Each structure stands twice: as structure tokens, then as C-alpha cells.
Regions:
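C-terminal substrate-recognition regions of SAM-dependent nucleic acid methyltransferases
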Residues: 159-327, 333-396
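Short, amphipathic C-terminal "tail helix"
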Residues: 400-410
Length: 410
């Protein structure tokens, strides 16, 4: 095909079929140059809509604006978009660029669905699978898991497999929503350069377990567990005793820390100082949160450890005797006896326990809800992997998967 003919066809395609929503005025100019080069007489339909995130509070209205030809400097009837594709902005920066920054990609995905195209294909973070800020992502997660029009999804544990210079905590995924598709999703996981693919009902759980083989193990185990008989029911919530991560430096701390044990300051507190576990002392009367557990035997578990791909999954647990509390760095599990606490530690150290936690873990954080697929046991005795594999009827293949995935805690 001659160059003139190629350019003519591309010009016609741009005019009739390509419409780009840009997040900044500068992006409009970049889009024009990318699509049309220096053909200044060509029509390039790229628009910037001010305060677009505010407008997304009413997505039906915004969708009507986008389908209005006047928005794109065109005439005629309302536009019907056949496909929506893109890599939307991921988050509003809260200052740190970390996990507390508000996600916004879900708004663009929901807007795409509101436009009612035949196809949607977006690249977005995978954090919505099982974590993220619940008030912002829970409805989006529920909608995605129950959408039987999602025909394909590919998840990458390492975002650099897609964008070599960009690290996105929790990885990335892209998906295809096909209005004509109705049924299971062809799901692929790319991890360590290997791809595994399986047909999946995304709505099997209230989260999306990233690893298909692990999803099958979780399903088998949970079929044998009664409601509310899982470890999340005994693990504390965040900041369990109201003490921040480093009580010396935090301006939010209302508890005074002392480095010497005394009759007045008789409760030990485990906290993190310069990345080192440190013990100090506090007054019993200064603990206002979960004070009834001060005189119970406890197991302290780091709230954050490694990453969503870490083969250890949870941090090193620590037995805490009666008369102890911890900072925000840790969660805790209370027990009536030291033996029960130490037997729980034996359970936590098993690969069985930790692989079930990993089903929910997609970042470094491990809140109590991440223990929801781990069944409770009789803690009058210690536990081993061999006992647990037999108790829940795991196959040789399932055991081999766990053994290859999870490393022992030394």
C-alpha cells in the first residue's frame, strides 16, 4: 500500500474510531502528536475534562457527556463506543507514594463499564484482588468477581514484567471484558517467568486468590471448616493496644515509655526502634485498649513482613508472657496458658498455615483478615505439616506445591 493511501486510511480511522480521554491538558497535545504527528489539519479526538475525579461521583452523567458528540467537537447522534482500552491512573498521591495513597483506577474501570461497550481491556494494579482500602475497593472487587462477562485475565506478580522500570506493589493485571461472553474466565498467572492458565469462576471467594492451585487447596480446606472457626477470629486488629510503631518518635502516642521496670511501670511493651525489636515498660493504667488481655499469654506476630511474593509469608512470631503489650508493629493472639501460645507458634511455623495466609496476601501487610482461610486447631498440642496434610486430605501434588512455594522459618 502506498504511503498516501496508508495515511488516508489512518486519518479516516482517527476521525471515526479513536477517542482519547486525557488526564491533563499537556496529555492532549502529546496524544495529538502521537496519533497524528505533525498533520495539524487532521481531526484528533482527545479531550481533557477538568475535575474528572469529582465528576466520577456521578458516573452515569459523565458517561452521557462522553457519548455526546459535542464533547469531541463532532455532530450527529450519540456515540456508541465499541471498545474501551487503556492504562488508567492508579492512585492519588498522599505524599508517600505508598500503600495508603488512595486508589483511583477503579473509578476509570467502572466508568468504562458505564459506557456499555462491547469490549473493555484495562491494565490496573492487582491489589483489588484481596487488599487495598476497603471503603474504596470493596464494591469494585465485588463487581469484578461477580462479572461473568470477564472472559480473560492475566495477573503478573511483578509489575516489571510489563513495565520494566516501574514497580507497583502487589503486581499488575489486565483483563478483557466481553459483553458477548457469559461464563468462567480464562485466568493466567505469570510468576518468575512461568505462566499457568486455568478456567476459573472468579466468584468462588469474596477475594480473588491469585494462585489457581492455591485456590483449589483453600476450597478443599474450607469445605471442612465450620463458620467462625478460623484464625482471623482470634487475631487482634491493627494497633491492638493503642501504641504506635515507635512510641518515642510518634506525635500520636499517649503512652509514656520507660526503660526501667518498676512497680508503677510493670507492663513490658515490644516495639520497633531503628528496625530492631526493643522492649521497654509502660504503666498498666495507660493502656486503654484491650487492657483485659494484658495478663494473658500472647503470641506477637508482625503486621507487615516481606512482600506479597515472600516465601515466608509471615514474620517471626514471638511468645509474650503475662504482663505484656505491643506496639502497632505487631498483632497478637491471646491464650490462657503458655503451652497453648507455644503450640500456636508451632502451627504458625508450618507451611500449611502460611500458604493459607498467602492466599489473601498481595502486599507486605498481613492484617487479621488475611488469616481467614486458616482453620483453628486444638492448641493443647503442637502441630506439624505432616499431621495437617493428612487431616485435610491433601494430595501429593498439593503437598508438593506447598513445599515448593513456602520456605521453612529458621
Amino acid at each position: 500500500m502506498e504511503l498516501d493511501e496508508t495515511q488516508r486510511l489512518w486519518q479516516e480511522t482517527l476521525n471515526a474510531n479513536v477517542f482519547v480521554l486525557c488526564k491533563t491538558p499537556m496529555a492532549v497535545n502529546i496524544t495529538r502528536r502521537t496519533l497524528a504527528g505533525y498533520q495539524d489539519t487532521w481531526d484528533v479526538h482527545a479531550v481533557y475534562i477538568p475535575r474528572i475525579l469529582d465528576r466520577m461521583e456521578d458516573k452515569p452523567r459523565l458517561a452521557r457527556k462522553l457519548s455526546n458528540p459535542k464533547t469531541w467537537m463532532k455532530e450527529g447522534e450519540r456515540l456508541k463506543f465499541d471498545a474501551v482500552v487503556g492504562n488508567p491512573p492508579y492512585q492519588l498521591m498522599g505524599g508517600s507514594g505508598g500503600t495508603n495513597d488512595a486508589p483511583i483506577y477503579q473509578h476509570f474501570a467502572e466508568l468504562a463499564t458505564e459506557l456499555n461497550p462491547t469490549y473493555i481491556s484495562l491494565i490496573i494494579p492487582s491489589r483489588w484482588f484481596s487488599t487495598g482500602r476497603e471503603n474504596l475497593l470493596s464494591n469494585f472487587r465485588n463487581a469484578m468477581l461477580t462479572d461473568c462477562h470477564i472472559s480473560k485475565m492475566v495477573a503478573y506478580t511483578d509489575s516489571r514484567d510489563i513495565f520494566p522500570t516501574v514497580e507497583v506493589k502487589g503486581g499488575l493485571c489486565y483483563y478483557l471484558r466481553d459483553e458477548k461472553h457469559l461464563g468462567d474466565c480464562e485466568y493466567s498467572l505469570v510468576k518468575d517467568g512461568q505462566r499457568q492458565t486455568a478456567g476459573r469462576n472468579l466468584g468462588d471467594f469474596d477475594i480473588l486468590i491469585r494462585e489457581p492451585k492455591l485456590a483449589d487447596i483453600v476450597k478443599k480446606v474450607m469445605m471442612q471448616v465450620k463458620p467462625n472457626e478460623t484464625v482471623d477470629t482470634i487475631v487482634s486488629n491493627d494497633t491492638p493496644f493503642g501504641i504506635p510503631t515507635n512510641p518515642h518518635t510518634s506525635g500520636k502516642n499517649s503512652v509514656t515509655i520507660y526503660h526501667t521496670l518498676s512497680a508503677e511501670h510493670d507492663v513490658s511493651v515490644l516495639y520497633l526502634e531503628k528496625m530492631t525489636r526493643t522492649t521497654a515498660y509502660v504503666s498498666r493504667n495507660s493502656i486503654k485498649k484491650n487492657a483485659s488481655d494484658i495478663d494473658k499469654h500472647k503470641v506477637f506476630i508482625p503486621e507487615a513482613a516481606g512482600s506479597g511474593n515472600d516465601p515466608y509469608v509471615v514474620g517471626k512470631p514471638e511468645y509474650a508472657p503475662i504482663g505484656s503489650v505491643c506496639s502497632q508493629t505487631f498483632l497478637y493472639v491471646p491464650f490462657e496458658t503458655e503451652q497453648e501460645a507455644r503450640n500456636f507458634i508451632s502451627y504458625l511455623r508450618t507451611k500449611f498455615f502460611r500458604v493459607l495466609v498467602s492466599a489473601c496476601k498481595i502486599s507486605q501487610h498481613t492484617p487479621s483478615k488475611n488469616y481467614r482461610f486458616v482453620p483453628l486447631q486444638d492448641f493443647s498440642k503442637p502441630w506439624t505439616d505432616a499431621e495437617l496434610y493428612e487431616k485435610y486430605g491433601l494430595t501429593d501434588e498439593e503437598i508438593a506445591f506447598i513445599e515448593a512455594t513456602i520456605k521453612p522459618i529458621e
